[in-house]
């Protein structure tokens, strides 16, 4: 069980931070327990707020469960970040508005050229940033160490848009140095360490 696994990991000497990346579907059932066993934050995948588009992407009709998971994590006091894959057909504005309403950082991740992504024609985060700037105001790269430390260490480059109160991060898996700052051990859903 995930909670027992995290409890065990927390006891390992040298483990400083445990952050979980999840689709959020079961998070509504475990948010409080995850906080209690020492999870330091959760990154939740949310590629759309449109139920039909969500179904096309995931093959599941579980958008409401994901949204409930986000609420449960926040209620439990877990720091939450939202992740969305930067697909060419993505309309980022509903996600930005949701992040703003929920006061959560939002990160856009370029599509990786593996599996389905090999056949996919994406757009760069630079293009997406320009699209967002047209709606959300001027974008300034965040450089203040104190502000950035709240975002945690990781591959995202954060921007503050003049008309938004939440930061928007961009993880450039293709057009940037995606893994040059990685300092993580990852446990896959299948139980493998990467």
Where are these regions (language model features)?
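Radical SAM/AdoMet-radical enzyme domain recognition
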Residues: 2-109
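Auxiliary Fe-S-binding modules of radical SAM enzymes
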Residues: 100-101, 111-194
């Amino acid at each position: 069980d995930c909670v027992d696994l995290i409890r065990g990991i927390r006891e390992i000497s040298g483990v400083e931070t445990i952050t979980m990346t999840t689709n959020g579907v079961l998070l509504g059932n475990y948010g409080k327990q995850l906080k209690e066993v020492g999870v330091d934050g959760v990154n939740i995948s949310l590629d759309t707020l449109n139920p039909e588009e969500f179904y096309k992407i995931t093959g599941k009709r579980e958008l409401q469960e994901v949204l409930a998971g986000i609420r449960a994590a926040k209620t439990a006091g877990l720091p939450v970040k939202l992740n969305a894959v930067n697909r060419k057909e993505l309309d980022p504005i509903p996600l930005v508005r949701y992040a703003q309403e929920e006061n959560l950082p939002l990160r856009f991740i370029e599509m990786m050229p593996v599996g389905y992504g090999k056949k996919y024609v994406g757009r760069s985060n630079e293009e997406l940033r320009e699209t967002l700037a047209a709606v959300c105001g001027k974008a300034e790269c965040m450089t203040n160490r104190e502000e950035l430390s709240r975002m945690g260490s990781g591959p995202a480059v954060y921007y503050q848009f003049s008309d938004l109160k939440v930061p928007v991060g961009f993880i450039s898996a293709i057009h940037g140095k995606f893994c040059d700052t990685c300092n993580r051990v990852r446990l896959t859903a299948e139980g493998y360490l990467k």
